[in-house]
């Protein structure tokens, strides 16, 4: 090796290298049991490791019998005979990638004698003068030896200095190996798989990113210590545990409301921004969530996905199916002695009989109000505590009862699952349908004791009775005027705000109430 070559190798910048190799005859080395063809293509070298021993198969160094130790590596591209499944020890086969501690340490292929394609070995690299055309190898042994001779020592010291500067600048460890399209014997694969299991998934023969074998099998290795629920990813477990700890790290800057997940915050912020990215292609109605759009689109498609198992009748909504299935429940062995109404469960009969007896065993400690069921008491107590655990994701409105939330959400989805069999009019609540059907039947069960006027709904009777008793519970904060109905107060407040939501389509005149708009329409009819 000439002094110019040594200096070029020592001062060479770090970068990918290609070393040309001439065709050579097969050679035998001590410790070689057998040989087979090794096909290695596109071997790339990229990351820092310590003290790789390499050798030059040149005549000058071969005569001296020297082994040169460098903290560098090369790119090999060779096709030749190599020992099969045998350790080379300290011997070096020119042009062949031998088993090394680099491969062993980083969990990649260290088996010789296999046909390998696209092997990317990420170790440090330097440039070699291609004029020499001398094949370099990575030896089995990784050693640090004092360089022999002053010239070689100076060259190695410069190479080490460049390497240390590179490591300090990058501050990264790129030691990883990717093996693609690797054809290995089954015995070797089994050995490597055992290593993978022992390492807990950190060691993997697979190409690309490291994968945990437990998650590949559909298992859920991350378990909540509170409730025992399992997750396939640790990140999902962290989010889940916030349910138990009450942690809500994602806070809205507009209103201060906090959420467990960032996705919930994004949906919530659309209330303030007014953004509705999910638009119905049929009618143009927009929604803040894709789930609400899906429910809405059933109105247009009339898709009936909920089928009855008894008669195969299909419905668009689960609530419609649940109501229909009551038709098939014929066995009602628990009958009320007072009114003859039957029930499928004795507990339902006991609760029903309290209507006749007037028994209300569940009383509120704050106000003394009593209820026939404990569930009703729990909901009532929230009126004292102010607790509203059920929140609408669309607009953020909260409710003390889950059933109230379900009814409210139909405002956003436009769902009206209760249809009148007489006229086909649909309603979002069953109670509204029952009241409506009394128009057809003429049933007016709620009668005023003062004047004898009857009504289809108890709330209508309550409002009417305020005429007799003079009660006006709804007061305007601006002027102090009081009203018998909340709707009357809402209309009145528009006189202060100037809001006029009802607009005439013909002339553009706007009004504070629908009744005023209807009165205005009559002027156009006269014309």
Swiss-Prot record:
Signal peptide: none annotated. SMART domains: ZnF_C2H2. GO terms for molecular function: DNA binding; DNA-binding transcription factor activity; DNA-binding transcription factor activity, RNA polymerase II-specific; RNA polymerase II transcription regulatory region sequence-specific DNA binding; sequence-specific DNA binding; zinc ion binding. Keywords: DNA-binding, Isopeptide bond, Metal-binding, Nucleus, Repeat, Transcription, Transcription regulation, Ubl conjugation, Zinc, Zinc-finger. Its main location: nucleus. InterPro entries: Znf_C2H2-type, Znf_C2H2_sf, Znf_C2H2_type. PROSITE patterns: ZINC_FINGER_C2H2_1, ZINC_FINGER_C2H2_2. There is a cross-link at residues 20-21, 99, 117, 125, 144, 158, 189, 214, 276 (Glycyl lysine isopeptide (Lys-Gly) (interchain with G-Cter in SUMO2)). It comes from the Eukaryota. Residues 9-221 are annotated as: Globular domain. It is found in: Nucleus. GO terms for biological process: cellular response to retinoic acid; regulation of DNA-templated transcription; regulation of transcription by RNA polymerase II; spermatogenesis. A zinc finger (C2H2-type) spans 222-244, 250-272, 278-300, 306-328, 334-356, 362-384, 390-412, 418-440, 446-468, 474-496, 502-524. One of its GO terms (cellular component) is nucleus. SUPFAM superfamilies: beta-beta-alpha zinc fingers. Residues 16-38 are annotated as: Disordered. Belongs to the krueppel C2H2-type zinc-finger protein family. May be involved in transcriptional regulation. Involved in cell differentiation and/or proliferation. This is Zinc finger protein 35.
